[in-house]
Amino acid sequence: MNDSALDIITAHARDGARLRETFFAEQATMLRETALRIAACLARGGKILLCGNGGSAADAQHLAAEFVNRFLVDRPALPALALTTDTSALTAIANDMDFSQVFSRQVEALGRKGDILVGISTSGNSPNVLAALEAARRIGMLTLGFTGRGGGRMAALCHMLVDVANPSTPLIQEIHITAGHLLCQLTDYYLFENVAALAPYLHADTVNED
């Protein structure tokens, strides 16, 4: 019996490298603009809320930790909170209301106008993430989506969209966390190294009204 493990490894590495090169070549300007808006939100005293399910929940927690602790350089802590970690709140909302509201209820409690909600869903159609984005827009928050396959229903609810045009969920997730790392690095850059670039964003109304 032939062992095709090495072929599987080679194919995955090849496909991932091709997707990564294409995505970042095409989306560099979008990532820069998104980082500027995140940095401006934080500079104005806002915060970042993040949500997702399964692997996307892990990404939400991972990125929140990078903001709160540090990324590549020592700097002040930045306010970010993953809405996936409070088991008492999650189970109470799911039990008393509905699982589709586990994030939106927290957004209603914690979100403020000018804050940013990051919703992560490889399909772009997770009901509880959609509900959270809708709640965020009602409050006047900026919405950032990490999606795949064209963005699904999330595309219409996001002011900023990191969409990975690929059918493979694992490859989408790999690009998501790499893009998230870049946004952390660029946010630090604009907050602590190139503050002048933030000037046009600090006083602009960055929320597009529906």
From Swiss-Prot:
Q: Give the record's pathway.
A: Carbohydrate biosynthesis; D-glycero-D-manno-heptose 7-phosphate biosynthesis; D-glycero-alpha-D-manno-heptose 7-phosphate and D-glycero-beta-D-manno-heptose 7-phosphate from sedoheptulose 7-phosphate: step 1/1
Keywords associated with the record: Carbohydrate metabolism, Cytoplasm, Isomerase, Metal-binding, Zinc
Q: Which reaction does it catalyse?
A: 2 D-sedoheptulose 7-phosphate = D-glycero-alpha-D-manno-heptose 7-phosphate + D-glycero-beta-D-manno-heptose 7-phosphate
Q: Which residues form the SIS domain?
A: 38-202
Q: Where is the signal peptide?
A: none
- Stored InterPro entries: GmhA/DiaA, Phosphoheptose_Isoase, SIS_dom, SIS_dom_sf, SIS_GmhA/DiaA_subfam
Compartment(s)? Cytoplasm
Q: Which residues bind Zn(2+)?
A: 62, 66, 173, 181
**Cofactor, free-text remark:** Binds 1 zinc ion per subunit.
Q: What class of enzyme is it?
A: isomerase
Q: Which GO terms describe its molecular function?
A: carbohydrate derivative binding; D-sedoheptulose 7-phosphate isomerase activity; zinc ion binding
**What functional role does this protein have?**
Catalyzes the isomerization of sedoheptulose 7-phosphate in D-glycero-D-manno-heptose 7-phosphate.
The record's note on quaternary structure and interaction partners says: Homotetramer.
Which named protein is this?
Phosphoheptose isomerase
> What organism is recorded for this protein?
Desulfovibrio desulfuricans (strain ATCC 27774 / DSM 6949 / MB)
